[in-house]
């Protein structure tokens, strides 16, 4: 998910901008709250996910932002929600193909007249030669959240992070806790024939790839590089040798507090491999924070009480009780059933057993109560022409020196207690400012107040 926000639903949105700008920070070079702790560049702009500069109803065009927030009172809906935009005009809204309906989209990349739309079920390729009538060229079914996509020449790179993604793109998932069938990392496709992508190879990583960023090195035209940001738990070393979830103090080879750098030989992309794992988060303290707003605490408590009354499952995380969704609970209930040698629907005893085990399960997923700085980035934006990158890394915004592309180094870091989750970063054209966005509540549970 990037600074240019796309609908989280399964349709292709084509928008026309009234104020076109040439952005040097593309996907190859990635396209007001409390004051930050320290500036990264000449000026650092912090923009929250609920910025009030959006304006005017969808379909109308205005050069100046209106004073009233037009989002107030918009109707809800999955595909027919009310819309508000400023200096953007919606040209088309094309439903997803059948295998991608109701599944979350992630990112867009471009190849000639085509838009490649990442989706948790794989990717779709749209011919947008006429943006008013996009034409689906292919829907490539290959599940693995979140399928962040990037293109370099004839190569398509796709992120995989979910535990159910398979190296063979199968849809049956991976039921085993340790399996060589699981894909968590980067998939590489040859899209010379856009209607028939060829799956060339994959590069497995310890934490998978939530997002990735392509980086070209002016000094190395024979290769392209990929910065991988993985935010999932560390996989078992029995599944991928060398993976360790211990802290760097306990294990210098820890998969935490680092990114992965993949080198892709353009003549032989199937030989792509990790060449470094820079610890760009080393020695960062826990960012400042404050508690949830009273209305959020009350709302969470009410939802949890109602869920418990219905027989639902809840968990306490950092002092607040949350309702656990069925997509989280159902696989664990199935495991309880299989663990006792049973089959079919879970029984009341199975539910009781899971409730007893949940506190330990959640504790392992969330980690200890000891707060640290970030252990990964959500996204990295690069500007190779000036040798800099911006990292939106959960609790911090980072400025990186990428003059040595394979070995990025941290130049500075800022934090802000009024930022919930540093989500994306974008440079201005002359590289003197870096814009960060905040993902408040998470992509699936957005908040705006």
Ranges and model annotations:
Residues 12-13, 173:
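N-terminal targeting/docking segments
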Residues 4-11, 46-47, 64:
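A subset of signal/propeptide-processing and intrinsically disordered low-complexity segments
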Residues 50-449:
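Feature marking well-ordered beta-strand scaffolds used for ligand recognition
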Residues 36-48:
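Bacterial N-terminal signal peptides
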Residues 1, 14, 19, 44-47:
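Short hydrophobic transmembrane-like helices used for membrane targeting/insertion
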């Amino acid at each position: 998910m990037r600074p240019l926000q796309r609908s989280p639903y399964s349709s292709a949105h084509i928008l026309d901008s009234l104020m076109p700008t040439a952005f040097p920070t593309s996907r190859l070079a990635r396209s007001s709250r409390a004051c930050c702790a320290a500036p990264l560049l000449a000026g650092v702009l912090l923009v929250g996910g609920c910025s009030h500069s959006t304006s005017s109803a969808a379909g109308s065009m205005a050069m100046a932002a209106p004073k009233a927030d037009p989002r107030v009172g918009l109707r809800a809906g999955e595909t027919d929600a009310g819309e508000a935009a400023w200096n953007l005009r919606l040209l088309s809204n094309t439903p997803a193909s059948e295998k991608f309906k109701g599944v979350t989209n992630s990112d867009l990349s471009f190849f000639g007249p085509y838009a490649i739309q990442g989706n948790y079920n794989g990717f779709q390729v749209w011919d947008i030669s006429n943006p008013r009538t996009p034409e689906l060229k292919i829907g490539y079914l290959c599940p693995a959240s979140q399928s962040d996509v990037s293109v370099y020449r004839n190569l398509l790179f796709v992120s995989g992070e979910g535990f159910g993604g398979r190296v063979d793109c199968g849809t049956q998932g991976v039921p085993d806790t340790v399996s060589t069938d699981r894909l968590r990392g980067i998939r590489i496709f040859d899209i010379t024939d856009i209607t028939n992508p060829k799956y060339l190879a994959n590069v497995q990583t310890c934490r998978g790839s939530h997002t990735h960023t392509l980086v070209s090195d002016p000094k190395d035209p024979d290769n392209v590089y990929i910065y991988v940001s993985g935010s999932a738990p560390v996989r078992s070393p029995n599944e991928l040798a060398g993976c360790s979830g211990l802290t760097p103090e306990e294990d210098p080879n820890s998969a935490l507090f680092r990114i992965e750098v993949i080198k892709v030989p353009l003549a032989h992309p199937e030989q792509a491999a990790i060449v470094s794992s820079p610890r760009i988060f080393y020695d960062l303290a826990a960012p400042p924070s404050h508690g949830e707003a009273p209305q959020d605490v009350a709302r969470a408590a009410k939802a949890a009480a109602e869920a418990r009354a219905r027989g639902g499952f809840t968990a306490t995380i950092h002092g607040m009780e949350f309702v656990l969704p069925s997509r989280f609970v159902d696989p664990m209930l199935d495991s309880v059933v299989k663990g006792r040698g049973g089959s079919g629907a879970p029984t009341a005893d199975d539910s009781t057993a899971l409730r007893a085990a949940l506190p330990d399960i959640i504790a392992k997923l969330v980690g200890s109560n000891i707060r640290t700085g970030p252990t990964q980035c959500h996204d990295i934006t690069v500007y190779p022409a000036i040798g800099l990158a911006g990292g939106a890394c959960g609790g911090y915004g980072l400025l990186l020196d990428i003059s040595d592309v394979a070995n990025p180094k941290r130049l500075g870091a800022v934090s802000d207690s009024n930022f919930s989750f540093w989500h994306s970063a974008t440079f201005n054209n002359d590289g003197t400012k870096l814009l960060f966005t905040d993902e408040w509540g998470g992509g699936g549970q957005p908040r705006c107040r």
